[in-house]
Amino acid sequence: MKILKTQTLRGPNYWSIRRQKLIQMRLDLEDVAEKPSNLIPGFYEGLVKILPSLVEHFCSRDHRGGFLERVQEGTYMGHIVEHIALELQELAGMPVGFGRTRETSTPGIYNVVFEYVYEEAGRYAGRVAVRLCNSIITTGAYGLDELAQDLSDLKDLRANSALGPSTETIIKEAEARQIPWMLLSARAMVQLGYGANQQRIQATLSNKTGILGVELACDKEGTKTTLAEAGIPVPRGTVIYYADELADAIADVGGYPIVLKPLDGNHGRGITIDINSQQEAEEAYDLASAASKTRSVIVERYYKGNDHRVLVINGKLVAVSERIPAHVTGNGSSTIEELIQETNEHPDRGDGHDNVLTRISIDRTSLGVLKRQGFEMDTVLKKGEVAYLRATANLSTGGIAIDRTDEIHPQNIWIAERVAKIIGLDIAGIDVVTPDITKPLTEVDGVIVEVNAAPGFRMHVAPSQGLPRNVAAPVIDMLFPDNHPSRIPILAVTGTNGKTTTTRLLAHIYRQTGKVVGYTSTDGIYLGDYMVEKGDNTGPVSAGVILRDPTVEVAVLECARGGILRSGLAFESCDVGVVLNVAEDHLGLGDIDTIEQMAKVKGVIAESVNADGYAVLNADDPLVAQMAKNVKGKIAYFSMSKDNPIIIDHLRRNGMAAVYENGYLSIFEGEWTLRIEKAENIPVTMKAMAPFMIANALAASLAAFVHGIDIELIRQGVRSFNPGANQTPGRMNLFDMKDFSVLIDYAHNPAGYLAVGSFVKNWKGDRLGVIGGPGDRRDEDLMLLGKIASQIFDHIIIKEDDDNRGRDRGTVADLIAKGIVAENPNASYDDILDETEAIETGLKKVDKGGLVVIFPESVTGSIEMIEKYHLSSE
């Protein structure tokens, strides 16, 4: 077997609306394409031996062992690869469960789809699954050492991809409140919400965190001075820069015991406490100086007591933890080294921030701490005897936490909240040393030793003893107070034809409200009046530009087939989803071979509408109308006829619809009617001569109306939207030349040709078409373009795209010509493959009063060419 292609889906997609994080592998089964597992000698035995945990997979049997039963009875390798990829991730600590395997129209080629937690780990699991299967097929086995290495690699990928525990805690709380989030590339920053309603976090820093507060908190001596000036109890201390200043500094703080720590340190690095001799002080100075970027060392009076972390969020105390340094307790027989190994094997401990607790590491600092207690690594501790491995109680160095939130004295709460405000932090971790947190600091000689920006949440969320505290909730409350919205309205538009016009018209209607509208289309990404990026921008990457922009108040997103298949949607749900039509275009691409499969692709938009939103569906297109059964939100239809049975039934049920009736675009709900405007007064309809543009206007108007836009603003929007080259390039752009007219439209499929033809057929003069088609379409589709063109035009010029998408020069034109002749053997046509030359010929050949219709590859180039021709002919 070999992998032909791997892609990552990150939003609602063809395979699942709810399970949005999926790996899709295109797999060639090669020699085993016709061999189910029961026909491969030793395969079942080899698979069970290396992965016995597959017994937990139910598969379609709905009971434990169901999948292995299918392997024993005979199933194909694509299905087996799917289950192995899932199981490998499970074994590496990433819980997943969803998978699908489907054969494509090419025999032996399968799409294998499976869930992932972390993208790189998921892709790697897919590669390992194929390698494992190939090994069992050819040798009957897969090495245990190889599997161990694979799982180790997967765990490394998981660790490298995982967010920190504090960030993860905040994200889980956001998800519980249906707040969308996305990871920004800049320094592991996370965006919560969309557009103008977004907030950002980085670990436990937020976009509300003041830089002055962070700077002050990082300046430990400055923090202490500021707090002392405010009457807060802090340790006596001073800063030194050279070792020969140490003796004077010790005297200044009142002598031993003392604490030495780096001026700009963190996570307890370089700190030594309870120093009682000159030798200890000199050794501690070397440690602290080495841990400081500026070689600056704080010398402080040591205060006896327990180490506490007090967490203040948005001015309110939310949690208190007593922190105990990394330590081991003797059992009377084991050495300290053995006790450390035993402690590190506890399931709650992991490397770094991988788990609730961090494994205890042995280094110069820990050996020094042991030495000061009179211990070595080979010391056997008495039963119950405690050996500390760190002087500081940070969880990151192996410490543990005990929740003391309910025990802290009210005066200490007041002091902590005051400290956070004095330093200027919205989220502050305040380190308190006191013999008794239940008594006021001032009564027991307690002190504030540090204030930390970006404090860790792990000790509060998962203490070793005591109640876990949901400290993420007050963070979300602060970022989104009083249920402030995190989302912006998202209106998504899809279909085979008309997407760009409908998207731009809908965005134009929304701009009448005065809101900042961001939209994506086949011509570019737009924010308000300005284009951000030119080009075909109808995929999730482009949509992400809009959703990340902090100025955008409304997002209108054109969603094309390619992006949905390639990556899924950029959003997990939308407020309004518009499906215009489904026609035979792009068939044979991306394993979408039938129009029913294409309808499933387009239906992703309708199925992604949230429960309070609306799916706006074309009642005149049976494939679109059928999507209603899978919509979890509300449904509104549009139609070119009030007599459409779906419309009649929908209105009978008090549903909402937009209909073209008696020359008007009207909205119906139950028995009442609201007329938007007469079609001939809406420029995009070409004086009501372009039925497909009327349908687009109906869809856009209805989408705006169901989302609460006032009818007068909708009317104002459709009246002022002019389908010119500037407003809608390549969409029914009509140019009046001196003696004839030119129409440019980006129609490139049979349905598009028919739509433009409904307008062209009403033209009174000569009708000349400059036509072509994309090279990646099926032969029958290109021939159909020729057949339709012969019904529309008096004369045809066939040209080809510069990019024929894999076809030889001239083959596209030959197929179109075959279609023309098949429809009308006497049809008048020429082959002029170069687009520019073909257009120039058409402009010279058309009769006075005639119409030249251009279906271009380059919309911009064609428009510029016509505008120059117009100027030169005046």
From Swiss-Prot:
Enzyme type, top EC level: ligase
GO terms under biological process: biosynthetic process
GO terms of molecular function: ATP binding; cyanophycin synthetase activity (L-arginine-adding); cyanophycin synthetase activity (L-aspartate-adding); metal ion binding
Domain ATP-grasp: 224-480
Keywords tagged on the record: ATP-binding, Ligase, Nucleotide-binding
Superkingdom assignment: Bacteria
Pfam families, sorted: Cyanophycin_syn (PF18921), Mur_ligase_C (PF02875), Mur_ligase_M (PF08245), RimK (PF08443)
Alphabetical list of InterPro entries matching this protein: ATP-grasp (IPR011761), ATP-grasp_RimK-type (IPR013651), Cya_phycin_syn (IPR011810), Cyanophycin_syn_N (IPR044019), Mur-like_cat_sf (IPR036565), Mur_ligase_C (IPR004101), Mur_ligase_C_dom_sf (IPR036615), Mur_ligase_cen (IPR013221)
Temperature optimum or stability note: Optimum temperature is 50 degrees Celsius.
Catalysed transformations (reactions): [L-4-(L-arginin-2-N-yl)aspartate](n) + L-aspartate + ATP = [L-4-(L-arginin-2-N-yl)aspartate](n)-L-aspartate + ADP + phosphate + H(+); [L-4-(L-arginin-2-N-yl)aspartate](n)-L-aspartate + L-arginine + ATP = [L-4-(L-arginin-2-N-yl)aspartate](n+1) + ADP + phosphate + H(+)
Residues involved in ATP binding: G495, T496, N497, G498, K499, T500, T501
Enzyme Commission code: 6.3.2.29, 6.3.2.30
pH dependence remark: Optimum pH is 8.2.
Keyword S-adenosyl-L-methionine carried by entry: no
Keyword Nucleotide-binding attached: yes
Role noted for this protein: Catalyzes the ATP-dependent polymerization of arginine and aspartate to multi-L-arginyl-poly-L-aspartic acid (cyanophycin; a water-insoluble reserve polymer).
Family indicated by similarity: In the C-terminal section; belongs to the MurCDEF family.
Complexes and interactors: Homodimer.
Protein known as: Cyanophycin synthetase
Source organism (scientific name): Geminocystis herdmanii (strain PCC 6308)
Lineage: Bacteria, Bacillati, Cyanobacteriota, Cyanophyceae, Oscillatoriophycideae
Gene encoding the protein: cphA
